[in-house]
Amino acid sequence: MKGRRRRRREYCKFALLLVLYTLVLLLVPSVLDGGRDGDKGAEHCPGLQRSLGVWSLEAAAAGEREQGAEARAAEEGGANQSPRFPSNLSGAVGEAVSREKQHIYVHATWRTGSSFLGELFNQHPDVFYLYEPMWHLWQALYPGDAESLQGALRDMLRSLFRCDFSVLRLYAPPGDPAARAPDTANLTTAALFRWRTNKVICSPPLCPGAPRARAEVGLVEDTACERSCPPVAIRALEAECRKYPVVVIKDVRLLDLGVLVPLLRDPGLNLKVVQLFRDPRAVHNSRLKSRQGLLRESIQVLRTRQRGDRFHRVLLAHGVGARPGGQSRALPAAPRADFFLTGALEVICEAWLRDLLFARGAPAWLRRRYLRLRYEDLVRQPRAQLRRLLRFSGLRALAALDAFALNMTRGAAYGADRPFHLSARDAREAVHAWRERLSREQVRQVEAACAPAMRLLAYPRSGEEGDAEQPREGETPLEMDADGAT
């Protein structure tokens, strides 16, 4: 009897061990597969993951929810602070903002009116301004694709914002003697792209013989600057850069807003971003006018598609590339530039859409560091938009700058013999010229490629009522902050 009970207990133990072993065998693969599924989910949309991953929006949002009433109180308190040093970061990221210097990046693309917007900063006496310094990098690394250069652009931007211009030595043309000091060791101001129109370079103290003082508002004549202002060592320009309370850099070669997140999180930079948009049809019209000057840049933008099927679909849509049956046709020489410009614009519109959705989902601290501006609003209401821009940047208003902005939008005509030369333009012509100069097929192509971004930016399709109307409620990509900035 006792032996039977002992055998029964041993049998129960064995059965229990067998059940536990079976459960372990079932759970281990399930856990491992779950981890792999999570990785697959992260890789499901790699393009969006690259953008959203760096922001850590969910973590930032969770941090904001934990702050609750404290974050709201901080925002209310920030509204009462001096506009010179606004409180722009909530406790969600725990950043200590540097209040000694403000950095602004003007985020735009080619032919959107960014030169005019940048010139408004260039004219302000409290601003140290650089015009498209990343041009040097693109020229040195051509031919490349825009996407692979984004990290290098960000690193270059970080150095320039810190008034460290030694990075330019990596990309300066080796055969340009004017760009180097007599000892050939250091660069000079002549190494900077468009240095002849820079207000700091073309005015005292760097240029004692300049016809205008730094505080005097007015366009710099490039030939006059070259004649009166011999190049000086780049170290002297770095010293001047450190004196200014606001540093502004305008460029058109950074495609994704998400690339700037490490800089926005850097408490030592105190960075804000002004992103400029323009009706894609007007952009395309302007790009066609200056097609040869933009050909290299368009190729670099379009090369980002060579790694995907969409690039081949673009080729087929334009009647070139491999077709079923193995037949292919080379691109005709005449419309080659137009083809590259059209394809590049499609890539740009996709980047716009990513930026708009990206900023729309950003936490509150980041939205307060981002200003969305449409070119049409800037040229139609220059004074109002200038006040909005200066308030966002922490800069004082100037009557002379107000008059300058108004005069620059009241020119005699839109067309110019020098498409890359800044001059006064007719604002109405600048807004509506595409209607008369683009064919119906060209308009159709642009609207088909850019429809999602156009909808978020409140640009109506051709044939619809209105033109560049203000975004309707519920369609704005970003919420307004207390200042009305988006």
UniProtKB/Swiss-Prot annotation:
It holds the Pfam family Sulfotransfer_1. Keywords: Carbohydrate metabolism, Glycoprotein, Golgi apparatus, Membrane, Phosphoprotein, Signal-anchor, Transferase, Transmembrane, Transmembrane helix. Residues 80-90 have a biased composition (Polar residues). Residues 35-486 are lumenal. The keyword Membrane applies. One of its GO terms (molecular function) is N-acetylglucosamine 6-O-sulfotransferase activity. It is found in: Golgi apparatus membrane. This is Carbohydrate sulfotransferase 7. It comes from Homo sapiens. The lineage of its organism: Eukaryota, Metazoa, Chordata, Craniata, Vertebrata.
